[in-house]
């Protein structure tokens, strides 16, 4: 497991070039932490936007099977690149950014992008170009390897004549195992990131380019972040797609064609998300996502290595990933002389633990608030006894939240509590020092919910409980409905740092009438009767009427 953790960190190995701007001079939307240039510091950065600007890349690896540290690694322009055809190569890793679909038969491309109006009509954007001319690497249709391009820009002109430009980084990450016989690409994740931008020019802007990075135990992928640190969402040499804030009330619609279907869960920075997936006979898939963007805290700060608690130091051994002043910061065994800015993962127990350890050191406050529209797949699994409910079902559900970090994978099904449990985490305060209010959305396929709970066809009822890390209830506004084969639940208005969300589903058995029978008729089974109980909390009394009434959280039966 330690090796796998190390390998995942390799994807975040970047070297920062000095940037003169300081946070106070930069609008919050363009804020991105810069790396200290003096020795002996450790920085925390929760902002995961670096992952949304990852360039297209195709790597060939020796000893590159999953869970191993590659002994050798090469950048490839295609599967036929000389260094990438060696008999020692046992795997390829790729990140393929899509361009616009050119014909109805194309896959692994963007079909359309636009904004949904109040009457549900859609204003479609115009594709302008891919940044970075030409394909970054060639695909191979026979092996299901997509072509890798640079990110694209699209324009929308309003009725008042105002033109807006958007940067789209939409694509898939995947893997080719040459030792398992098939030698064909397998899509491991799907990512779609949209951002309003304006184009600016300057010699200081450098395109994000994939690199091979030497590590203490081998090699790993990496890329430069110069343009991100300068407030750009995308870049090419001499040009920057400078980030602009979203209108949080607009609903953006993205339609993508994939050569392989999305599996599991879709999660990300989405509000009021609705996802439609259509799979064709050839196993290709059309994914349509409509959602509003969200404002997310960026938690960031530096502490001298010598002043860090031991529990924090233990998270960053020699070879840890992040952004350093140079490659020596990744290799040196003298950790007190190293300066490293960690890049938090967006999900998982490790990410939640890491942020919880840093928040007290950073006053539990965001350094900036930035807007995002991001959707990506996540592969986490349910417990063994529940996996039959999702195995082979393809797309299972949607999770949208404004939390900085959150649980990895789908909500965990607690059989004893009969609840779906999820943990989210963020700073208690926003960048202005005001309480940051949480948002959480769960769309769960109705057939999956019925399987998990053993429900019949009657309508499902749900209850959302939000409690703080110490177990006390948190005030939240919840909305629940079942429609078109989906159970949709949202919770909002709760506060952080790491609240736990529990979704409890229930279903009342439908009343049945006695069937006709010969005389004498047997006695009909009694219909379940509702009863009323009184519940108290301090001086407040509530009456609850149900077949099996229970008191709300915080109340006791009188």
Q: In which residue ranges do the predicted regions lie?
A:
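A short beta-strand micro-motif
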Residues: 531-538
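Long, leucine/valine-rich, helix-dominated scaffolding and oligomerization segments
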Residues: 24-378
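Solvent-exposed beta-hairpin/edge-strand motifs
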Residues: 102-110, 132, 454-471
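Solvent-exposed serine/threonine-rich low-complexity stretches and specific carbohydrate-binding patches
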Residues: 473-485
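C-terminal beta-strand-rich structural cap/linker in extracellular carbohydrate-active enzymes
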Residues: 485-515
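Proteolytic processing hotspots in large secreted/extracellular or virion-associated proteins
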Residues: 401-462
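Short Cys/His-rich micro-motifs in 6-15 aa windows
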Residues: 554-558
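Secretory targeting and sorting signals
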Residues: 1-25
């Amino acid at each position: 497991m330690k090796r796998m953790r190390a390998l995942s960190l390799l994807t975040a190995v970047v070297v920062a070039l000095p940037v003169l701007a300081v946070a106070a001079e930069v609008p919050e939307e363009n804020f991105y932490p810069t790396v200290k240039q003096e020795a002996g510091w450790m920085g925390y950065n929760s902002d995961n936007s670096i992952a949304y600007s990852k360039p297209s890349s195709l790597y060939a690896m020796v000893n590159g099977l999953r869970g191993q540290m590659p002994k050798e690694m090469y950048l490839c322009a295609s599967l036929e690149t000389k260094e990438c055809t060696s008999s020692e190569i046992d795997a390829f890793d790729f990140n393929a950014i899509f361009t616009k679909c050119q014909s109805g038969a194309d896959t692994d491309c963007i079909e359309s992008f636009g904004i949904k109006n109040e009457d549900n009509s859609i204003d479609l954007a115009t594709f302008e170009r891919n940044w970075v001319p030409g394909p970054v690497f060639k695909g191979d249709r026979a092996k299901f390897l997509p072509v890798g391009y640079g990110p694209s820009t699209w324009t929308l002109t309003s009725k008042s004549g105002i033109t807006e430009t958007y940067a789209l980084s939409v694509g898939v990450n995947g893997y080719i195992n040459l030792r398992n016989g098939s030698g064909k690409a397998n899509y491991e994740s799907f990512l779609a990131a949209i951002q309003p931008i304006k184009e600016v020019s300057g010699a200081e802007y450098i395109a994000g380019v994939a690199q091979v990075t030497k590590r203490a135990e081998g090699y790993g992928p990496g890329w430069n972040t110069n343009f991100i640190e300068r407030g750009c969402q995308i870049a090419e040499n001499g040009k920057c797609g400078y980030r602009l804030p979203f209108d949080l009330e607009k609903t953006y619609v993205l339609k993508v064609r994939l050569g392989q279907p999305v599996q599991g869960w879709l999660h990300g920075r989405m509000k009021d998300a609705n996802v439609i997936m259509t799979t064709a006979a050839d196993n290709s898939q059309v994914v349509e996502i409509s959602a509003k963007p969200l404002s997310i805290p960026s938690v960031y700060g530096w502490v001298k290595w010598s002043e860090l608690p031991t529990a924090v130091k233990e998270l960053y051994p020699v070879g840890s990933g992040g952004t350093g002043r140079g490659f020596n910061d990744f290799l040196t065994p003298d950790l007190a002389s190293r300066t490293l800015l960690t890049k938090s993962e967006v999900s998982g127990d490790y990410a939640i633990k890491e942020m919880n350890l840093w928040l007290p050191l950073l006053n539990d406050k965001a350094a900036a608030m930035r807007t995002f529209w991001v959707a990506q797949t996540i592969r986490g699994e349910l417990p063994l006894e529940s996996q039959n409910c999702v195995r082979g079902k393809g797309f299972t559900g949607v999770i949208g939240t404004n939390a900085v970090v959150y649980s990895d994978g789908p909500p965990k099904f607690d059989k004893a509590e009969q609840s779906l449990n999820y943990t989210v985490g963020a700073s208690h305060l926003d960048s202005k020092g005001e309480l940051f209010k949480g948002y959480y959305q769960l769309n769960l396929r109705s057939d999956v919910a019925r399987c998990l709970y053993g429900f019949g066809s009657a309508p499902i009822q749900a209850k959302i409980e939000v409690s703080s890390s110490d177990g006390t209830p948190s005030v939240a506004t919840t909305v629940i409905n079942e429609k078109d084969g989906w159970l949709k639940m949202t919770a909002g208005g709760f506060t952080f740092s790491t609240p736990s969300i529990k979704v409890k589903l229930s279903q009342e058995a439908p009343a049945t009438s006695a069937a006709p029978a010969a005389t004498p008729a047997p006695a009909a089974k009694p219909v379940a009767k509702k009863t009323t109980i009184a519940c108290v909390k301090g001086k407040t009394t509530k009456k609850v009427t149900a077949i099996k009434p229970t008191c709300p959280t915080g109340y006791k039966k009188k």
